[in-house]
């Protein structure tokens, strides 16, 4: 096992974990913290172990706090305790750190595809079929908090969104708190999905 301590960061340890790569038995301890803000013009990914995972994350633990803010974003944001975007396997990974996100959508009201994807373990997954993508035997113990105004809001204890991903034997033990706002006085959030898993 390897432990990282006293680390203050604005991005994950690995920006991208590539195909066939394995990150195993790595712990981010409670002395670590992440504060991150998207650049507004591109999709944004953040997770303590990996921002984007194409490989395997196994036996990893996060105890650090993540604080994300969207600065008038035009695109979607994916934030998770272990990884922001998962495209392959996350197994036996636990999150104990609090994960929070706030901020507002900065695009035209006609652009309804942008969203916040916030989860204790994984932020989200691609919205197209992935035959092997899997989240299994993972637990979240941290508090997940979201406050903001986006067309779409997906918040979960394990994953904000896991479309086309198999999720098995996962448990959420943390609180999930959401205060989604309308993006204009005459509008309401188009999509609001909140769950323990």
Language-model features, listed with the residues they occupy:
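Surface-exposed loop/turn motifs in large extracellular/passenger domains
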Residues: 1, 6-197
């Amino acid at each position: 096992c390897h432990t990282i301590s006293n680390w203050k960061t604005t991005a994950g340890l690995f920006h991208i974990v590539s195909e066939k790569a394995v990150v195993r038995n790595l712990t981010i301890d409670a002395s670590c913290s992440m504060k991150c803000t998207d650049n507004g013009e591109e999709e944004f990914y953040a997770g303590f172990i990996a921002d984007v995972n194409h490989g395997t994350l196994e036996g990893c633990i996060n105890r650090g706090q993540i604080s994300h803010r969207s600065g008038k974003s035009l695109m979607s944001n994916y934030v998770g305790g272990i990884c922001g975007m998962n495209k392959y396997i996350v197994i036996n990974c636990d999150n104990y750190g609090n994960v929070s996100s706030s901020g507002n959508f900065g695009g035209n009201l006609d652009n309804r595809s942008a969203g916040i994807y916030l989860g204790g373990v994984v932020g989200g997954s691609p919205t197209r079929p992935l035959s092997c993508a899997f989240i299994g035997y993972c637990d979240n113990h941290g508090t997940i908090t979201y406050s903001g105004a986006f067309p779409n809001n997906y918040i979960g204890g394990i994953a904000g969104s896991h479309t086309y991903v198999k999720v098995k034997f996962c448990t959420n033990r943390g609180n999930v708190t959401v205060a989604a706002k309308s993006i204009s006085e005459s509008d309401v959030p188009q999509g609001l999905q909140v769950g323990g898993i």
